[in-house]
Amino acid sequence: MAKNTSITLGEHFDGFITSQIQSGRYGSASEVIRSALRLLENQETKLQSLRQLLIEGEQSGDADYDLDSFINELDSENIR
C-alpha cells in the first residue's frame, strides 16, 4: 500500500529530479525517488553479500599457497 511521506531535498537534488522529469525519462518526482531507492536497495544488498562472503573467507582460515608452485604452473601454461 502506498504511503505519502514528506522529505526535504536540497536544491541540487530538487534540480536533478526536475531535469529527469523534463527529459521525459520519468513522469513524476515519485518515479525518480522510487528508482533511486531501488538502486540503493540493490547496492545495499550487494554490499551485504560481499560483507558476508568476506566474513566466510576470513573464517575459512589460511589457504595452502606455494609461490614457487604457482609460478611453475603459470610457466607451464605459457609453454603450451
Curated annotation (Swiss-Prot):
Keyword Cytoplasm annotated: no
UniProt entry tagged with the keyword Zinc-finger: no
Domain of life: Bacteria
GO molecular function ontology, one term from the record: toxin sequestering activity
Keywords: Toxin-antitoxin system
Stored InterPro entries: ParD, ParD_sf, Ribbon_hlx_hlx
CDD domains: RHH_NikR_HicB-like (cd22231)
Pfam families membership: ParD_antitoxin (PF03693)
Alphabetical GO biological process terms: detoxification; regulation of DNA-templated transcription
Family of the protein in this entry: Belongs to the ParD antitoxin family.
Function text: Antitoxin component of a type II toxin-antitoxin (TA) system. Neutralizes the effect of toxin ParE.
Protein name according to UniProt: Antitoxin ParD
